[in-house]
C-alpha cells in the first residue's frame, strides 16, 4: 500500500508499511504492518492510486478513519470518529490545506445527533460499528 512518506524515483512509495485486510463498498480497509495490537494510528498521507480512498478500523473492528486522496495522491480530507477536543467521540471531517489539518467540521455531536446530514448520508455506509 505504501508508507506515509517518500516517493521512490521509480514511482510509488518506500517500503510497504500497510496491508489490505478487507473492503467496505469497494474501498480498501488498511492495517499498518507491525503496529502494536491495541494501537490504531492514522492512514498514510499519500495514496498509491490517484483519487483513491482508504479506511482504517480500530482493533475491535469499529470505524476509525476514512481518508480520500486527490489526483496528486495527497490526502484531501478525512472522516474521523474520535474525541477531538471532546470528552466523548463524535464523527467529524478534516480537510487538508497542504500538510496542515485544520480544526474539524462536526458531522455529529458527542451525543450522537447528526449535525451535517448530507455528509452523514454520503459516508454512513463506511461507518462500521458506529451507533448514533
Question: Locations of the language-model features?
Answer:
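Catalytic toxin/effector domains delivered as secreted proteins or via bacterial secretion systems
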Residues: 2-132
